[in-house]
Amino acid sequence: MSNQLIYTGKAKDIYTTEDEHVIKSVYKDQATMLNGARKETIVGKGVLNNKISSLIFEKLNEAGVATHFIKKLSDTEQLNKKVDIIPLEVVLRNVTAGSFAKRFGIVEGILLDTPIVEFYYKKDELDDPFINDEHVLFLKIADEKQIAYIKEETLRINQLLKGWFQQIDLQLIDFKLEFGFDKDGNIILADEFSPDNCRLWDKDGNHMDKDVFRRDLGNLTAVYQIVLEKLEQL
């Protein structure tokens, strides 16, 4: 049966379709932080995130990255391949910021010599703890070959994204990815890519991402609209 709600997330609701291997993602006008401890309805956010993520995933597909994205259905909806999500948040950092800067007691804005890939165990009740490769193996989340592939693919995606954002005068500071197994057991990129799960700074150091909400820096949808308009120039 199609159009049955199967999952409610912080930013999206997931529904069944007529194809058991395809799902419909519906983006919501909700902003959260601290694993949902703070929630706000922000009108227009769902439309912007769907448009931005669809645009990015289309470009990643064209570049040969295996993703779950099929197509954008409407302003707030998209079709995705159904995946078995790997319970890892994969974070790539190009520049010191956020929790990374806080953890090591350093200032934000330091360009890292090489990008750093981090893993966080995707478990809300544990506040998504920072884990290493050995923890991933112990928890049987992924094997060594799969860990290596996820890291390599994350680094490749970073190179593509950095290049695209440089073209529109935005610096990609860091971002979070999620991967999953498709129906054939292949690991593919899932979830979304939007200013909700990355940090972007303009040439003046202004935040063009969800930090505008986290730090009460201004109008979130106005910032996301600027990011969308810039991406549409690519």
Swiss-Prot record:
Copy the pathway line from the protein's UniProt record.
Answer: Purine metabolism; IMP biosynthesis via de novo pathway; 5-amino-1-(5-phospho-D-ribosyl)imidazole-4-carboxamide from 5-amino-1-(5-phospho-D-ribosyl)imidazole-4-carboxylate: step 1/2
Pfam families (UniProt xref): SAICAR_synt
- Highest rank taxon of the organism: Bacteria
Positions the record marks as coiled coil are none
InterPro entries found in the cross-reference section: SAICAR_synt/ADE2_N (IPR028923), SAICAR_synt_PurC (IPR033934), SAICAR_synth (IPR001636), SAICAR_synthetase (IPR050089), SAICAR_synthetase_CS (IPR018236)
**What biological-process terms (Gene Ontology) are attached?**
'de novo' IMP biosynthetic process; cobalamin biosynthetic process
* EC number, UniProt record: 6.3.2.6
Q: Which GO terms describe its molecular function?
A: ATP binding; phosphoribosylaminoimidazolesuccinocarboxamide synthase activity
> Signal peptide position in this chain?
none
Report keywords, A-Z: ATP-binding, Ligase, Nucleotide-binding, Purine biosynthesis
Which Gene3D superfamilies does the entry mention?
Answer: ATP-grasp fold, B domain (3.30.470.20), Phosphorylase Kinase, domain 1 (3.30.200.20)
Enzyme class, UniProt record, top EC level = ligase
Catalytic activity annotated for this protein?
A: 5-amino-1-(5-phospho-D-ribosyl)imidazole-4-carboxylate + L-aspartate + ATP = (2S)-2-[5-amino-1-(5-phospho-beta-D-ribosyl)imidazole-4-carboxamido]succinate + ADP + phosphate + 2 H(+)
Q: Which NCBIfam families match?
A: purC
Q: State the family it belongs to.
A: Belongs to the SAICAR synthetase family.
Name of protein: Phosphoribosylaminoimidazole-succinocarboxamide synthase
Lineage of origin: Bacteria, Bacillati, Bacillota, Bacilli, Lactobacillales
Gene name of the record: purC
